[in-house]
Regions:
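Active-site proximal beta-strand in glycosyltransferases
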Residues: 104-106, 121-144, 172
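Membrane-proximal helix-turn-helix segments that form the acceptor-binding/catalytic region
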Residues: 122-126, 138-139, 151-171
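N-terminal subdomain of nucleotide-sugar transferases
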Residues: 4-59, 126-129, 166, 174, ...
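A conserved catalytic-core segment of Leloir-type glycosyltransferases
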Residues: 38, 45-104
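C-terminal alpha-helical cap of glycosyltransferases
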Residues: 199-215
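Short N-terminal targeting/anchoring amphipathic segment
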Residues: 20, 94-115, 130-134
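Helix-loop-beta element that forms the nucleotide-linked donor phosphate-binding surface
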Residues: 179-197
Length: 215
């Protein structure tokens, strides 16, 4: 895997449109959205649960509801298929994303069971939309979730095939160690960037530089 380090802000074209997706709004997402708007760009936040303490911003798009999430969690716990349900919810979200036609889709977190990852990957690939996926060691898709029936080989094979075929995917890790762990879990073969979240202001500028470079 090639690790690319982005440490400066370039001159941006006016009018980037960025969709940020996560289970809930985070302070980092809020900071990115605020900075994008200061630069004359558009930020659309899509989450399952809306606002969280410290974010100071509500989601622009709501992803499913508590019943959808409960069903997803129950099915995933029974069959070790976290991130492989909520097809209807994911289709609804994708319809709205396609209508928005963003320059970049930023998946700020996929560790909670609220969307269908393989389905989302397939549609975004077909639409040829650049995607940035942020991961930490504890939020690598397909890892760290408990289930009644463990199906390690099936889960790993599904995630490897999903991410292996995902064209225009850019992986953003908070450390080189996380990048190495992600590669071990089948997320290798994509441009990989290291953006530490220790300094929020610096991370925001690096993310916006990344959007401009991959759009």
């Amino acid at each position: 895997t090639n690790f690319l380090f982005s440490n400066y802000l370039t001159n941006f074209e006016v009018g980037m449109k960025i969709v940020l997706i996560n289970y809930s709004v985070t302070p980092m997402m809020t900071a990115i959205a605020k900075r994008l708007e200061e630069l004359g760009h558009q930020a659309i936040i899509a989450t399952a649960t809306g606002d969280v303490e410290g974010s100071r911003r509500m989601a622009d798009l709501k992803i499913g509801n508590s019943v959808d999430r409960a069903v997803h969690n129950a099915l995933a716990w029974l069959s070790d298929t976290h991130g492989m349900h909520s097809t209807r919810v994911t289709a609804s979200l994708l319809d709205r994303i396609i209508a928005l036609n963003p320059d970049v889709v930023h998946l700020a977190g996929l560790n909670n069971s609220f969307i269908n990852i393989p389905f989302m990957a397939y549609v975004l690939m077909r639409c040829k939309m650049p995607v940035a996926l942020s991961v930490t060691e504890g939020t690598i898709p397909g890892t760290g979730r408990k289930s009644l029936i463990k199906r390690d080989r099936f889960r790993r094979r599904t995630m490897e095939s999903t991410f292996g075929a995902w064209d225009l995917l850019h992986l953003v890790c908070n450390s080189k160690h996380t990048a190495e762990r992600a590669a071990e879990e089948g997320l290798d073969g994509h441009p990989t960037y290291i953006i530490s979240t220790d300094d929020t202001a610096k991370a925001v500028e690096q993310y916006i530089t990344l959007y401009d470079n991959i759009k």
